[in-house]
Amino acid sequence: MLTIVIGLAAADFITGIIKACVKNDLSSRVMRIGGLHKICEIIVMAVACGLEIGIELLGHYYQAAELAAVSGTVAAGLVFGYIVLMELISILENYGEISPDAVWVLAIIQKLRGFQKEDTKDVQAKTHTTRKRK
């Protein structure tokens, strides 16, 4: 899992640099921040893998190996799935801005952003009503 995350993070970083070169918007500050984000993603995935191993070892210690294996795998799998999805979307966004022929990619990204805005509105509405109740 960690190898895939590292590969996707590198691909996203490289496509981001290509996009910046194509748009004449290359900035060392933006590259530094992007690189730090990628390092944080790799650290989070490494911690999730360590958590999976730790939960499995605890399961063996407490004679609940099957439950521990499942819960550790689910935890690491969810983190892995989120990071992979996030990286793939970012790579597609970069590709859509690099290639003028990638209209289909931009259409998909706009739909995803529409879903994201709706989700954000729902979260903000729930937060606002919760604050009113307090």
Residue locations for each model-derived region?
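Hydrophobic alpha-helical transmembrane segments
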Residues: 15-27, 31, 84
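Membrane interface segments of multi-pass transport proteins and intramembrane proteases
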Residues: 25-29, 60-67, 96-103
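Short, aromatic-rich membrane-interface segments at the entry and exit
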Residues: 1-2
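Hydrophobic alpha-helical transmembrane segments and immediately flanking/interface helices
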Residues: 57-87
